[in-house]
């Protein structure tokens, strides 16, 4: 009888490329979920479960794991708030005030975690984008939006402005229309 000898390659440990803030927020969410379960706070429990499932789905969908940072959390949280605001409008239109109130309370829970993230606010982004675009307008007054996006160093901007590339893009587009069209 022959024995097969398998060489067992040491399992490579999955390296997490997440920022420490990302991991801290997830840890806080899990701790708060346990606390909500022990205090039987159903609303907070479902809101935190929803947040954690959204984060997990984003982790699964992410092609580049290094993009899982506080900025991706900020984008996910703001998307969740926008979805709930849309739901509230629908519930009010259909005279379901009880469900609208539930979603308002979930927004409060999500906003609690959103405010804890060290990310620039929308007003800060708007002022930084305005300043940035005015500087570009002085050097190149006939700049087009496509040319602008080609000139932007996105890695430097996300670090300097403390915001995700997605939120910077949307802010620059909205401010570009105001500055370069006038």
UniProtKB/Swiss-Prot annotation:
Any GO MF annotation of the entry: carbon-nitrogen ligase activity, with glutamine as amido-N-donor
Transmembrane segments: none
UniProt xrefs under InterPro entries: Asn/Gln_tRNA_amidoTrase-B-like, YqeY/Aim41, YqeY/Aim41_N
Localization per Swiss-Prot or TrEMBL: Mitochondrion
A Pfam cross-reference name: YqeY
Source organism, top-level taxon: Eukaryota
GO cellular component: mitochondrion
Keyword entries, A-Z: Mitochondrion, Transit peptide
Record: transit peptide: 1-17
The family this protein is said to belong to: Belongs to the AIM41 family.
Protein name: Altered inheritance of mitochondria protein 41, mitochondrial
Organism: Candida glabrata (strain ATCC 2001 / BCRC 20586 / JCM 3761 / NBRC 0622 / NRRL Y-65 / CBS 138)
């Amino acid at each position: 009888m022959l024995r097969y000898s398998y060489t067992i390659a040491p399992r490579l440990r999955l390296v997490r490329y997440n920022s420490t803030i990302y991991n801290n927020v997830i840890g806080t969410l899990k701790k708060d979920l346990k606390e909500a379960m022990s205090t039987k706070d159903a609303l907070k429990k479902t809101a935190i479960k929803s947040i954690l499932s959204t984060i997990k789905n984003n982790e699964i969908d992410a092609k580049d794991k290094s993009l899982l940072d506080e900025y991706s959390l900020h984008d996910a949280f703001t998307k969740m708030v926008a979805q709930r605001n849309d739901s509230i409008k629908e519930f009010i239109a259909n005279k379901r005030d009880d469900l609208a109130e539930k979603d308002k309370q979930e927004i409060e829970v999500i906003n609690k975690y959103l405010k804890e993230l060290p990310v620039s606010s929308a007003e800060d982004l708007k002022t930084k984008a305005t300043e940035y675009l005015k500087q570009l307008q002085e050097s190149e007054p006939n700049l087009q939006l496509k040319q602008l996006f080609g000139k932007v160093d996105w890695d430097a901007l996300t670090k300097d402005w403390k915001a995700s590339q997605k939120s910077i893009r949307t802010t620059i587009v909205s401010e570009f229309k105001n500055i370069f069209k006038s």
